[in-house]
Each structure stands twice: as C-alpha cells, then as structure tokens.
Design a protein with these regions (language model features):
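A short, active-site helix/loop in glycosyltransferases that binds the activated sugar's phosphate group
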Residues: 136-166, 171-176
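Conserved acidic donor-binding segment of nucleotide-sugar-dependent glycosyltransferases
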Residues: 321-322, 326-333, 342-348
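A conserved mid-protein helix/loop that constitutes part of the nucleotide-sugar donor-binding site
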Residues: 20-25, 200-226, 249, 334
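Short hydrophobic beta-strand element within catalytic cores of glycosyltransferases
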Residues: 39, 306-309, 319
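A short, well-ordered alpha-helix in the C-terminal region of glycosyltransferases
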Residues: 335, 342, 349-365, 371-380
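Active-site donor-binding acidic/aromatic loop of nucleotide-activated sugar
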Residues: 243-248, 260-270, 276, 326-327
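Glycosyltransferase donor-sugar binding loop
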Residues: 39-45, 171, 205, 234-249
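Short His-centered aromatic/hydrophobic patch
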Residues: 91-97, 115
Length: 384
C-alpha cells in the first residue's frame, strides 16, 4: 500500500508558521517511507529548502480568497489529481480547502484537513466559510483545545462518516537541542543584538501583533523593575511587524514611557531561533488570545529553558505547570511580573531541573517524528 500512497498537500504559502512547517515535515517524511509527495502552494521562504528530488512542487495562487480563483484552482487540482493519480488531498487552510473539497468530490479521492487555528467568525457567512475544514473524511486538530473548539462550534458539520482526531503538532528536537550550539555563534548573536552578557536575558518571540501580548510584556517588565528597584535583565522582543508600523511605534513609545529604552531590544528577525533561545535565560509567551498550539512554549522546553506562558489555548497542554514551566493569568501584567520575579530568583539547580523536565516532555509528546508517523498512519488507515 505505502508505495502506492501519493499525497498532495495544499497550503497558501510555505512560510515559517506552524501549518507551513508541518506541511514541510510531512512532505519529506513520506518519501522516506516509500510514498510520493506533492505540494501545491503560491510560494514562500521554505520553498528553497524543499528537496525537489523527493517532493514535487506546483505553484498556484491558492492563497487567494477570490471565489473565481478558488474555482479555477479546483479544476487545476482535478488535473493534477488525475495525471499523478493522487491518493488523497490534505488541505491546511480554508481558501484552498474549498478548491480541494470540490476537486476530491469530482475525482472521488479522500480529503483530509488540519484545523490549525480557531478561525474567528463574527457572522454565519464567515462560519460557513470556516466550515470547509470540517467537511473532510479526516479532520485533524492540532491540540485538544482545537478539538473542543471544533466540537463546540462546528458540530452540525460532523457525522459518523467523518473522523475527528487530535494529532499534536511536533517540532524538530534535533534542531531545538541546547547541546548543538557553539559559543562563538552565541557571542556573535549577542553582539548583533547589542547586548553584553552581564545580565540575564528574557526573550519574547512572536510577530508584532496586539494579541501576541507585547504590551502586557512591557508593562510586566516595568512592574518587575519597580519591585526590584533596578534593571536586573535585558528584554528582547523578537519578531517582525509585518507592516504594522503603527503598532511597533506604539510599543516603542510604551517602552520609552516606562524608561525601558536601554533595557528592551526590538529585533526584527533571527534566522536561527534555537540560538536565540540558547542565549536567553527565560522565555515568555504572552498571547492574550488562545493559540491552537503555541510553538514558542514547545521550542523553549526543547531547549531546556524555563517558559512562562499565558494560561489559555495550547500552552495548557504543552506546559506541565510548575514542572516544565509556569502559567500566568492571560492579559494580566501583574501576574506575569510575579512569575518573572519568581523565575529570576530561582537557583541554578532548580532551573536545570525545569529545563531537563521540559526537554523530556517535548521529546516524548511533541516530537516531529511522532507527528509525522501518526499522520502517515492515519493516511493509510483512511485509504484502507
């Protein structure tokens, strides 16, 4: 069966997000297991890393929400399915999922979706648009939180013929491994960030957008400084504004208002995130809205770093509170500052124990190999 398995994944853009890296990982796992792997995408930064000998790429405007383009994409997908004798189609986003739904209905192929987020809906029309992710033969939720969200909001689209299940997202624990980084690279990165390693570093990774909680983080830093009476650490806000210039200016003004300009570094991008974690002492995930999975919390634990995260969404599942990290009340700067203070005051033995438990947690539960194997197994089960 496996040699006959031909999987076509469809994703708007192959960037560095969770859905995209999941697509990338599965695409390369399949050929290692004697399967054929195909991706349809509009482009993206990860494309240059795709092994073209193992994975065939088709470039289509599947990022578009234009109904006409969605229809045109569907007919092109039908052609690809028939020419390459595709076994199943796996959609990872809503607009291309509509194209995939039509293409699989016409060709009689199996249809799989991964529900990667909560997909906000303020109207029934938006909810119907979102519902395409539940119209598949197999619906994969990336966490128990997303599983519950689907059951609560999309139950009328589910039936006994459809399988809804959780397959936890996974990360590459060999890349996010604290033993693989070398000291000279750490020094170069700190120099680039204009940081002298005479104080601890608290890192907040994530693109600059209000729900990622940068404002709460800055307010918490101010509260920690007030409590201590001095600046005991550097704070790094690492992430692109992605064109949100006004929001970035707002954050800079807030840091100036609290007189934190010398303490906070705004860094747009870091091509080696494992290294960014390695040079940092405490990692924070400050999201004010629930994340489907929350990669930062998982990557930090894999790097044996203490993680402080808001108590909503996927972090509740990926962090063992008080053992591999700490949860605080989402949106509450005082709650976050208390956790930061507590972690700053911990002795090295306790911090090392938290780090060891964190890595053990990720290797056991959130390893990319486990995610790929589970997905591959479900593909085979669906076709059998």
């Amino acid at each position: 069966m496996s040699s006959d398995l031909k999987v076509l994944q469809v994703i708007p853009k192959l960037g560095y997000g969770g859905a995209e890296t999941g697509c990338f990982d599965i695409a390369h796992y399949l050929p290692e297991n004697n399967c054929k792997s195909f991706i349809v995408t509009s482009g993206g930064e990860l494309l240059k890393f795709v092994d073209r000998k193992k994975v065939k790429i088709f470039r289509l405007p599947v990022q578009s929400k234009n109904p006409l383009l969605i229809l045109i994409n569907a007919f092109i997908l039908i052609g690809i399915i028939l020419v390459y004798n595709i076994s199943l189609v796996h959609a990872r986003s809503r607009a291309p999922a509509w194209s995939c739904l039509l293409a699989t209905k016409i060709t009689g192929r199996k249809f799989v979706t991964t529900f990667h987020g909560t997909y906000n809906f303020k109207s029934n029309i938006k909810k119907i648009y979102n519902s395409v992710m539940t119209r598949a033969d197999l619906i994969i939720a990336g966490s128990n939180f997303i599983f519950s969200h689907i059951k609560k909001n999309y139950s009328k689209y589910l039936n006994e013929k459809k399988k809804l299940m959780v397959i936890f997202r996974g990360i590459n624990v060999d890349y996010f491994d604290p033993t693989t980084k070398i000291e000279i690279d750490e020094k170069k990165l700190l120099k680039k960030w204009d940081i002298e390693k005479d104080k601890k570093i608290i890192l907040l990774p994530g693109r600059l957008t209000s729900w990622k909680g940068q404002e709460v983080f800055i307010e918490a830093i101010n509260l920690v400084n007030i409590e201590l009476g001095y600046e005991a650490f550097y704070a790094v806000i690492l992430g692109s504004d992605q064109g949100r210039d006004l929001y970035k200016k707002k954050l800079i003004r807030l840091s100036e208002q609290y007189r934190l300009s010398k303490q906070i570094r705004f860094i747009d991008h870091c091509k080696d995130m494992a290294l960014a974690y390695k040079v940092s002492d405490i990692i924070v995930s400050a999201s004010t809205e629930p994340e489907a999975f929350g990669r930062v919390a998982v990557e930090a634990q894999s790097m044996e770093k203490p993680i402080i995260a808001s108590n909503i969404g996927g972090s509740n599942e990926t962090i063992i509170d008080e053992k591999t990290g700490f949860l605080y009340e989402a949106g509450n700067a005082k709650s976050l500052s208390n956790k930061i203070l507590r972690t700053l005051n911990m002795d090295e033995t306790l911090l090392k124990s938290i780090g060891n438990e964190g890595r053990k947690n990720i290797v056991q539960k959130f390893n990319v190999e486990k995610m790929c194997f589970s997905t591959y197994s479900e593909y085979k089960r669906l076709l059998n």
